[in-house]
């Protein structure tokens, strides 16, 4: 059923980048076309006291998140030691709107762990605090003084009874992941004993501040000891299952666990094995590997090989079904990276049968068995080939592309070596058939999936201090990349600074209500003038599920609803979808969860 009603009241806002890799499935899909990589619009430091070791920064900078009204919220390291604050900046020009300190202390580490924020549907941003707690604030787009509210997964009263003891003991150790109802999931390390006897744990806090947790030992059925540092929890498309990696006190043994989001009870535990040797795979606390959940409910997760180095330090990208059974050949590179999802329709170079492909870092490190020919790759999860280095059966390479900048530091033994790809997530833009990623050479690239070329390159820095970092896109199509401890906002050279407040010339897509929904959800869109628009429902792979409208509409607001059915009027599967509005030159989208 599609219901149309024209009224004349203001519309609502645009799409957002909500957490690590964009969403709770970590697919890194942009919901709007990205701007051309032509100019730096603004920049701001994400580390006020970067600690260089030579020209290297041993830190994983956390991902910015971006609200629907285009406010960019980012974690900022403020001291030489591990001290942080959160800043909110206007996406159009980088103007500082507000900032808040956090008393967060990361767990013991080699590389400084990422400080991972998440947006929640009730207009909040959550960020880690001391003692395993979360801090949140709202009014995110308002330039005013903000205060933080604390939420302890073990109860605020318990925390208040002895904050010093909990601060000394408990450390949030992963980026935060929020579901569509505002519950936030994360991992916790207990570095010393605490008054409640809480051990290493997987925790959740709902929007009312009520928490729950399960020990890693219980979650893994007695097999693991701690959550892997930097592993952002991933949610199934229906948000009924949480996936997270755990490990022993050292990097082995490693496990992937699936928990019920309702009570954190264990559904499945999968020991992670090196596909070549059969030994337990390495799960490193110095990496950033995070599960990615695909539209067919497969789970992809990257590990290091065991023994270390036998696969040229590339690791493996493992794939599992929803119950964590092995479900296909591994990718030949996996560790320190969250794979991105590329809809097959967004990759004209592809002619196979899979509905999606896997975009991955594909480095081949010099001096570790590789030749330094560092690439990024596009893999087919349904088809296999023999890897030229290991001789193992791996996911088929649909396309790969070599980094553009020679690496003389690799030495004369590696004349074809190039600078490596320093990314822990990329951005996939299905509208322009491209992937956006940064490299160690200080440049931001657009990889054109129609021509298998770098169609755009923008120099951000001379290539100094390139820590492993995320790439992010905003609701206006602006692209964000971190290079040399600085966040760069990148886009078209002819884009001027926008005034504060809504752009009256823009398309606007209202909030979907209810969300999640079981029968139907209602929403509005607003047009600044008469124009031809298309309104579609798409799935997380970018495939069209249903066209709700395709025609010319008058200026003003138009109300519609979606009943959860596809174009053939069949009931859609439970999961996350996007309602997308486009007029041919601009696009806005809203996320919705269907739970029939």
Segments predicted by a language model, with ranges:
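C-terminal tail/sorting-segment detector
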Residues: 547, 552-555, 559-561, 570-596
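Glycine-centered coil/turn sites that cap beta-strands in beta-rich domains
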Residues: 498-538, 559-562
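Surface-exposed coil/turn segments at beta-strand junctions on protein surfaces, enriched
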Residues: 516-518, 528, 553-555, 567, ...
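Extracytoplasmic/lumenal domain signature
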Residues: 13-59, 66-74, 78-112, 118-127, ...
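Short, glycine-anchored, charge-dense loop/turn motifs used at functional sites
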Residues: 538-545, 577
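Non-cytosolic beta-sheet module surface loops
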Residues: 76-78, 248, 524-529, 539, ...
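Sec-dependent N-terminal signal peptides
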Residues: 1-4
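N-terminal signal peptide c-region/cleavage motif recognized by signal peptidases
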Residues: 8-10
């Amino acid at each position: 059923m599609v219901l149309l009603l024209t009224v004349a009241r203001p519309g609502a806002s645009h799409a957002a980048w909500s957490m690590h890799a964009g969403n709770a499935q970590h697919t890194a899909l942009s919901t709007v076309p990205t701007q051309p990589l032509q100019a730096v619009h603004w920049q701001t430091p994400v580390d006020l006291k970067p600690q260089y070791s030579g020209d290297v920064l041993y830190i994983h900078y956390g991902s910015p998140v971006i609200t629907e009204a285009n406010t960019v919220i980012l974690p900022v390291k403020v001291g030489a030691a591990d001290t942080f604050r959160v800043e909110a900046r206007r996406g159009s020009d980088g103007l500082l709107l507000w900032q808040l300190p956090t008393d967060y202390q990361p767990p013991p580490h080699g590389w400084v762990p990422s400080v991972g924020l998440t947006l929640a549907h009730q207009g909040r941003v959550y960020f880690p605090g001391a003692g395993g707690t979360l801090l949140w604030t709202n009014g995110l787009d308002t330039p005013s003084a903000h205060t933080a509210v604390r939420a302890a997964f073990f109860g605020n009263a318990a925390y208040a009874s002895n904050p010093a003891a909990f601060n000394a003991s408990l450390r949030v150790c992963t980026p935060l992941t929020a579901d569509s109802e505002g519950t936030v999931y994360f991992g916790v390390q207990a570095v010393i004993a605490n008054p409640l006897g809480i051990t290493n744990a997987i925790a959740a806090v709902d929007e009312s501040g009520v928490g729950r947790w399960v020990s890693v030992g219980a979650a893994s059925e007695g097999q693991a000891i701690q959550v892997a540092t930097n592993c952002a929890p991933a949610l199934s498309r229906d948000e009924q299952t949480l996936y997270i990696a755990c490990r022993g006190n050292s990097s082995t043994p490693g496990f992937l666990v699936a928990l019920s989001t309702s009570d954190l009870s264990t559904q499945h535990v999968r020991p992670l094995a090196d596909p070549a040797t059969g030994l337990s795979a390495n799960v490193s606390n110095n990496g950033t590997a995070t599960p990615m959940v695909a539209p067919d409910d497969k789970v992809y997760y990257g590990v290091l090989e065991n023994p270390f180095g036998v696969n040229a330090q590339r690791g493996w990208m493992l794939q599992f079904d929803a119950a964590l059974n092995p479900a296909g050949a591994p990718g030949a590179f996996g560790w320190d990276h969250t794979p991105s999802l590329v809809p097959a329709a967004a990759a004209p170079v592809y002619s196979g049968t899979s509905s999606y492909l896997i975009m991955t870092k594909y480095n081949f490190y010099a001096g570790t068995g590789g030749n330094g020919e560092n690439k990024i790759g596009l893999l087919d999860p349904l088809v296999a080939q023999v890897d030229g280095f290991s001789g193992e059966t791996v996911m088929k390479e649909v396309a790969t592309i070599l980094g553009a900048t020679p690496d003389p530091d690799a030495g004369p033994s590696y004349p074809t070596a190039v600078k490596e790809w320093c990314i822990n997530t990329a951005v996939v833009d299905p509208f322009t058939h491209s992937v956006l990623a940064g490299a160690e050479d200080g440049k931001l690239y657009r990889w054109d999936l129609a021509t298998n070329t770098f169609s755009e390159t923008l120099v951000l820095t001379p290539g100094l201090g390139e820590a492993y970092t995320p790439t992010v896109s905003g609701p206006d199509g602006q692209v964000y990349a971190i290079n040399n401890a600085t966040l760069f906002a990148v886009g078209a050279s002819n884009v001027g600074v926008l005034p504060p407040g809504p752009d009256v010339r823009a398309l606007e897509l209202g909030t979907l209500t209810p969300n999640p929904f079981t029968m139907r959800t209602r929403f509005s869109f607003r047009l600044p003038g008469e124009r031809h628009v298309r309104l579609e429902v798409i799935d997380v792979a970018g495939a069209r599920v249903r066209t709700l409208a395709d025609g010319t509409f008058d200026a003003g607001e138009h109300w519609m609803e979606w009943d959860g059915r596809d174009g053939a009027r069949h009931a859609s599967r439970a999961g996350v979808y996007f309602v997308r509005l486009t007029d041919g030159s601009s696009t806005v989208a809203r996320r919705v969860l269907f739970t029939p």
